[in-house]
Amino acid sequence: MSDDGALLVLEDITVTFDGFKALNSLSLTLEPGELRAVIGPNGAGKTTMMDVITGKTKPDTGVLIFDTLHDLTRLDEPAIARLGIGRKFQRPTVFEPLSVRENLLLSLAGNRNPAFTLWAREKPSERERIDELLTTIRLTDDRHRRAGDLSHGQKQWLEIGMLLAQEPQLLLVDEPVAGMSDAETEQTAELLRDINRTRSLVVVEHDMAFVRALGVKVTVLHEGSVLAEGSIDEIQDDPRVIEVYLGR
């Protein structure tokens, strides 16, 4: 392999389900500190790609290396999470009866069992980290609010904050703005750019206006392979992409 120094390398990854190739010799490289957008029609392989990276699905063939040293194909999901890969699914999963602050406290890296954590006195370092996370996810004024009372967009931000509390190197985010208002969508683009100052991210999204707002390199998947890569303008002008999306 020739991707020395890359944070994540997928090389010729193939995944087959009952004879159907969900991923077909997929190759992709993510550099340290990069924010990458991944788009593609339904069935293009986006979810399967994230399943492979996180260990949920094992590839039939191919190379998958994280942080230049770790062969992810040999590790299970918990081990991959401990290495520093976090995943945000499309639907938010927060502890709705608890407050925003309590959700973040439970998620802090290295924290204790839930019952002890909620009743124990916060350490100064924990309080400081929670304050930082609240600022990042735009929920400082909602710290004592019940998570179940947040808007859909705010729940998405809270779950992103819960993942950040685990101190991942790489964050995989699946359709973060689905169901959001225009204002929340705009703030989410800002949020992900802020996170990208200290973390690498892969964002899977269908909303092209949101992808444009991110202003980053875009990878287009089609039939389990990379169809095109480039800026959003280059992607939208690519005849192959136009044919896949518009059928002409």
What spans do the regions from the language model cover?
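Glycine-rich phosphate-binding loops of nucleotide-dependent enzymes
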Residues: S2-R248
